[in-house]
Regions:
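ATP/NTP-dependent adenylation/nucleotidyl-transfer catalytic domains that generate, transfer
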Residues: 1-200
């Protein structure tokens, strides 16, 4: 099983579940930082992978996302109806979705194929219910083990995994206290912004 490991609670709980079920040798965790990802979440991701004993790699996405954006905005589109060429523009929201899709549809899906297995969807029920997700991005994957859990249940499951299942701190304490954030823009930092949702 291949899992995108961001340094947040959702992907960490998903990773711990699959390591418990499949064993660490059958789990590949990948951190995919962009220029918006904090050193803190990148460190938490690596600490989590190390504690779980799983396979781990880091594949940055900034260059590929910028390349995609340039292709989309600089390639002329011809209107045969209006007999003219035009070009598209990319809003900040579209660029956020490009990052999510690059992670899910390119990196994680490609790694899963090469690793010889499936990949997971790390979305929780809170995000799915309000539509805080990206098609072909963070909501793609063969299985969604926390898809029917509200965000506060994900935190509770994380504590349970530490205390009862692994009986040690496999999920770092910082993962329970850091501000939840997709880290897709400068407004979504774990220090000041975070997700646009208020989780109970």
């Amino acid at each position: 099983m291949t899992i995108g490991l961001s340094g947040g609670i959702d992907s960490a709980v998903t990773a711990a579940l699959f390591v418990d079920i499949l064993g660490p040798d059958n789990v590949l965790l990948v951190n995919m930082p962009s220029c918006y990802n904090s050193p803190m979440t990148q460190t938490i991701a690596e600490q989590t992978a190390q504690s779980l004993g799983a396979n781990y790699t880091v594949i940055p996405i900034t260059e590929s996302c910028l390349h995609t954006s340039e292709q989309l905005t600089q390639t002329p589109i011809h209107s045969y109806h209006q007999h003219r060429d035009f070009q598209l523009t990319i809003s900040p929201l579209i660029y956020e979705n490009i990052q999510s899709r690059d992670r899910g549809s390119r990196v994680v899906a490609g790694l899963a194929a090469a690793f010889g297995g499936a990949f997971s969807c790390n979305s929780n029920k809170t995000e799915l219910t309000v539509g805080y997700a990206t098609f072909y991005g963070d909501i793609c994957g063969a299985l969604a083990p926390i898809g029917d859990l509200w965000k506060h249940h994900v935190y509770e499951l994380g504590r349970y995994l530490n205390d009862k299942v692994f009986q040690r701190q496999v999920l770092p304490e910082a993962i329970f206290t850091i501000r939840p954030s997709a880290e897709l823009s400068s407004e979504q930092t774990v220090g000041t912004g975070g997700d646009p949702l208020v989780y109970p």
